[in-house]
């Protein structure tokens, strides 16, 4: 708050107070004269008052007295004092006029101070505006820096994605190189696949070139953005330093103006105090004695001179203040010009900032377009990855199914082992019972024919039970083999040509229509032992089948699962697409083949144990039939019931052999004794079931 100036009293009030003071002074003089001259009449006093110019006064009696001389002296003194008072009044009026002039000058100075105050307020407002603009610039700088960081992070993420995509492309190229090497080894029938792969390779190479060009463009744009950001930061730092210097100068100037203003106010207050003291001195009544009036007048004259000197000093001070105010006005004008220049600079800077923002917006749009393109490429790569993952999941599911099938096969093997053990026990029991019966028959040759009929019935029942078991086992194995073949076909259709991204489905449809090429041995296998075992499997199986056909005269080679496995192997080999990750499946298949061979060996051992017993039993039965009932021999035209059953079983046997695409041995027609025996036929019917497991 500015200090309130001391307001002078109204001039009419001053004149009234002066007149009152003069009247009071006159009354006091009259009282004093009455006290000093009590014998003087009142009329003389009035006459003396009226005669101002007469130097001599007369009494009522016409004689002079010393009181009259004193009275005359007093009158002269009063006249001189009145003259001096009139002069003083004139001086006072002149001082009043000077005071009015001074007040007018003070009012002008106040007006100038008010204008300076307004200018300072405007400067403060401009300073506040500049501070707000500075804060806005800081916020824009922060946002630009944040956006630049965000773009840098996004560029890093995109660079990482590009690196991952490049690595993926390299892996795909490696896979394609492997596939191309495999395709070079294949026959001319795979020309369509090679053309498709070449197209896909060209597409991948084009995409890679586009990605490399896009990466170079993104790196160049990032470098440009970083350079522009550095230049913008430098420019903002320089502007900040300039604004700080300008603010410091403005604050210094404001401080100096405030100090000068305080000094002016202090001076004005001192002048007002001196004027009030002068007024008080002028207002004091002349209570001095008549001889001291001259001294009072002299003092008043001295004071008037002193006041004139002070007034002159005040005039000089006012002139100096006016000059200072003029200088301040010039400074304010210069500052206004500077502020206008600064405003123009700020406008230019705002225009530059708007241009830079437009450039940044354009760059952002470009980066967004680049991001869109990169996102599209990333989506394509993701789709390819998803397809590969789906294929991997399918392969895993197939592996799980194969594992489940292996478990089922193990369970079936365990069941068959248990059945074999039961059959062995039954055979042992039958052998023991037959031996006991033969001993009894040898001991008692007069046995009835009913026992033989019972034996025949029991044999027929056993044959029927064995047939039912065989049918059930055949149905189960056929279902398992068909299910396994379907799974292997689906697996082969999925595994065909691994590494093909978008063209995989189209190739699957073409592969179903195209004929399958000849099987070839895969070169991707790591170990040579696996390949050698893989090559030796069909030879060993062929040798085993020949030996079984020669020895057993009716054994059928195991089909079903083994044929499905062979077909899967041939398809794998023909396509040349057995990956390195499938060696475990190959080893599992080889183990299954080894187990099948072990089962064959065990069946051969069982047959070797059972055949002599059956031969002995057959010869003994023929001897008993010829001895006891020679008339009951069947006619050559009508076959015996055992032979009919054997013939039916033989038809079934040949049907199974035709379904399994295995020709019977050449010695099967020559040796007919095993076919005549039902127990041998039961064993022959059980042996392929055991071999199929």
Curated annotation (Swiss-Prot):
Polar residues bias: start-end ranges: 54-69, 676-693
Residue ranges of coiled coil: 14-611
InterPro entries: GOLGA_cons_dom, Golgin_A
Compositional bias ranges of the Basic and acidic residues kind: 537-547
Keywords: Coiled coil
Keyword Coiled coil included in the entry's annotation: yes
GO BP terms: Golgi organization
Region feature Disordered, mapped onto this chain: 20-69, 497-547, 661-693
Gene Ontology cellular component list: cis-Golgi network; Golgi cis cisterna; Golgi cisterna membrane
Tissue: Highly expressed in seminiferous tubes in testis. Highly expressed in spermatids, barely detectable in late pachytene spermatocytes, and not detectable in spermatogonia. Detected at intermediate levels in pancreas and lymph nodes, and at much lower levels in spleen, peripheral blood leukocytes, skeletal muscle, liver, lung, placenta, brain and heart.
Family affiliation: Belongs to the GOLGA6 family.
Name used for this protein in its record: Golgin subfamily A member 6A
Source organism (scientific name): Homo sapiens
